[in-house]
Amino acid sequence: MSKPVALITGASRGLGAELAKSLSSTYHIIAVARTIGALEELDDQIKKRGGSSTLAPIDLINTNAVAQLCRSIFDRWGKVRLWAHTAIHAAPLGPVITMDSKDWEKSITNNVTVLAKLIPMVSPLLQEDSKAIFFEDTTIMKKFSSVYGATKAAQIQIVKTWQDECKSTGPKIYIAQPNPMPTAVRARFYPGENRKELQSIEKEAKKLVSLLKL
């Protein structure tokens, strides 16, 4: 397979899916998500564009499954040119004094612990000229966002630290902040928002590919 490999964790919908489609003209896509049906739909759309993908329907919480995936990637392709992590758990908005412990624990697991385990497992697949991209979301860092905001901030701090550590050696680590888009996460937070006023997910994905020269 002549195309370089792009690993998209959280590829079943939203920005992850649109990035996968936008990148499929120049990359072989490894699409990771829990939802098999959504991954199969993504695969169909990529094929219609003349691209190719490998589907990995796994839960990122499952460390053994992720380790097996990384080993399989190494055995087949040897390296990953691009890693985009878009997977996120969005706990409901609410006052700090009513924080639910289950929402907190699930958010810590999915948004912080998963990333803390992913980076050590994926990084051996990344070379000096590889790229990894993560996504900031300060548009929701306001009141009532304590659980989501805290875990998202922790996630980004991990990435910033890794970014500093890789400045002289590679890979290149990017932290991007797309404009507000009509994603399922945003709809959960702002159900009454006029989604027509938000930026197209497809356009934001294409803009990221262009700006970051992915």
Model regions: which residues?
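Conserved glycine-rich Rossmann-like NAD(P)H-binding loop of the short-chain dehydrogenase/reductase
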Residues: 26-41
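Catalytic Tyr-X3-Lys loop
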Residues: 97-116, 133, 155
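Conserved glycine-rich cofactor-binding loop
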Residues: 10-13
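Amphipathic alpha-helical dimer-interface segment in Rossmann-like NAD(P)H-dependent oxidoreductases
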Residues: 22, 71, 75, 110-130, ...
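Rossmann-fold cofactor-recognition segment
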Residues: 48-63
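C-terminal helical subdomain
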Residues: 168-171, 175-177, 183, 191-214
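Conserved mid-core segment of classical short-chain dehydrogenase/reductases
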Residues: 67, 88-105
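Catalytic loop of short-chain dehydrogenase/reductase
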Residues: 88-89, 116, 124, 129-168, ...
